C-alpha cells in the first residue's frame, strides 16, 4: 500500500493563531483492490507521519504517533466503538448558507454528523513503512466498514479496482513554517473525500489544487475561550455537554492560556 499523505487540520500561522484547512490523502494497494475481513472491515490506508506532503511540509512523527496513545481522546472513541468517517469534509457554513464563526466551525470539525457518516472505523494500526522515496515513515491503517447514509459511496469506491479511495484526516496541527514542519495536536477522525471517487492520486496532488485558501479560517485563543464559555453556560443550565465543547486539553497541547482575564480593581474602588 502506497500512501500519499497531505493532511487536513488547523495550521498555525503565529503562536496565537491556527487555521482550519483541508488536504488530501489517496490510498490503495498495488492492484487497486482492498479485501474485507470476515466482519466486512477493509484495512484502509488513512495517513502517514514522518513524511512530506506535495507542498513540502514535513509531518513530524513523534507528535503524530502520540495521538494513538491508549488514553488519547481518539483511541477512547475507538475503544467505545464510536469512531466514524464522514462523506466529505465539514464545510464552514450553517444550514441557512451563512458562514460559521470560528468557534462554531471548531466545534463542527470535532463532532460527527450522523447524517454524513459513510463508514465505521473499528481499529487503528500504526505500522513501519516507507514512502515513495524509500524513506521510513509511520503508516496509519484503519479497519473501516461501510456504514451510514453514505456507506454505499465508500463501499463503491473501496471495491472498484479502477478507482482510488481518498481519505483526509481532521486534525489540529501547529506549523513551524521556517523549518517546514507540522506538529499534530489533535485528531478528530478521517473523512472520505472526492465526490464519487477520484481516478488517480496525481489529480489531487496538482499544484493548482494543493491550497484550499477559501476554506481556511483563523482560530485564536479567544476562539477556544468562547467554546469554553458556551460549555459552562450549558452546564449551568443543566444540559449534558459533549466532548467537543471540552477544549481544556486542546488548549494545553497548543500552549494557550484560555482562562478569563482578571482585571485588578483600582484602589479607590476597593
Curated annotation (Swiss-Prot):
Keywords: Autocatalytic cleavage, Hydrolase, Protease, Serine protease, Viral capsid assembly, Viral capsid maturation, Viral release from host cell, Virion. It is found in: Virion. Pfam families: Peptidase_S80 (PF20034). It comes from the Viruses. One of its GO terms (biological process) is viral procapsid maturation. The self-cleavage of the C-terminus allows the activation of the protease. One of its GO terms (cellular component) is virion component. Its EC number is 3.4.21.-. GO terms for molecular function: serine-type peptidase activity. The record marks 210 as: Cleavage. The active site is at residues 89, 168, 191. The keyword Mitochondrion does not apply. InterPro entries: Peptidase_S80. Serine protease that is responsible for cleaving many of the prohead proteins during a major morphogenetic step in viral capsid maturation. Cleaves the major capsid protein at 7 [A,G,S]-X-E recognition sites. This is Capsid maturation protease. The lineage of its organism: Viruses, Duplodnaviria, Heunggongvirae, Uroviricota, Caudoviricetes.
